[in-house]
Amino acid sequence: MRRSGTPKTQKDIIRAIADVQIADAENVLKVMLGSSDENMQKEVLYALSRVGSKASLSDLAAAAEKAGYKMEKTGANEAYIALIKRVLEQGDTKDAEKAANDLLKKSTKAGMTQTREAALQILLAAKPEAATKNLLSALKDTDKGYRNAALNFASGFADQNVYIEVMKHMLKAKPEVKVDILNWIGRESKCPSKHDVIKNLELRFDLPARQVLLDQLKDKDFYVQQAAVWALVKIGDKSVIPVLADLLKSNDKQVILLGQDALMAFNGDIDQAVAKVIPSASDAGKIAGLELLAIRMADANLNTVLDQIKSGSSEVKKAAYTALKDVVSEKDFTLLCGMLETAEASAVAPLQDAIIAAISKQPAATQVSNVNRRMIQAGDSKRYLYYKVLSATGEKEALATIVEGLNKGNGAAKDAALDALLAWKGIEAA
């Protein structure tokens, strides 16, 4: 072949050998190694990675070492990795294992993380009985990328015993390793076939994995806490909701926000647990809790919101008023009207929004009828408070009432009527 035509022709032939995988060409290709032509060398190395056997391991190992175990023009390192995988597939397990071990040691010394990862992947596949041991060894490494690669590879063979050993390892690990493991456990739990295994996992008969994860919430390192919280959210065991809600009672704003985000994402009923912690939380925790009740539209917990309106700080009161519209229902109409008619100026708008929300499921005509009756009870001095509510109904009868208020009203009443007309969504008010 070395005498067959031009260099281009030779390269084309070598590429064809690689594509068709002509195993008999291995010895001829080995003779062609060491070409000063980088492109020719690249083709030969690639071809050997496709057609070679254990007989070519030492040759490609030397080429990879010369390349510094990194990507370069000849592709020697990639070719060597591919050949080791091929040798493993051919059933020469011991040879592949030996080569992978050697590559792992030398690439580690060279600081080539990607090559280390590739070697580890082969090693895990070559020796399944030692896979857990090799995984735990990798988790002791100082390179985060390498640790995470090991965990990702482990996803392919992880079972109950692997999860137990990894979580046991986590108990004694440094914070950065704990974070990697916790994130991995969370990802694993999202796999339908693995979810129940992880949810019901026990490290021993008196130590469920759930408790191990909950204990990480007490870790001094915030990132460990964060990773544990999200693992718990992904696992979705509803029994941990009260513990997550307790994060709202923290004095650390960062932890409060973590708890809020976790509860917001949790697929389950968080309302009662959140309502329970609000009274004893700091102002930041109270506000986070009120926002959660609003997001979850927790109308069964209206009283919790009302309590904060009565006794909270100015910031908490503002959050409670803002939440009000999302936690009310039709039955709260009379209560809200009473609050509106006695409210301070700053509370008028959120109370109006709450009334609009409370009656929003009624037919528009019924809304107008109910509001008109309440306006009569409120008296002339308070009628204007309901113009915004009437405007939200979109009913012509309501429009007439607002226009009348604009024409006959003075001061605040006239301003309220004008604002209501400006907020009208139809063209009738134009």
Regions found by a protein language model. Give the residues of each.
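Amphipathic alpha-helical surface "interface" segments used
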Residues: A100-K105, A126, I376-A378
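Structural detector for internal amphipathic alpha-helices that build alpha-solenoid repeat scaffolds
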Residues: M1, K8-A23, V28-G34, Q41-S53, ...
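Solvent-exposed loop and edge beta-strand segments that line ligand/cofactor-binding
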Residues: K109
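HEAT/HEAT-like alpha-solenoid repeats
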Residues: A64, D95-L103, A209, C337, ...
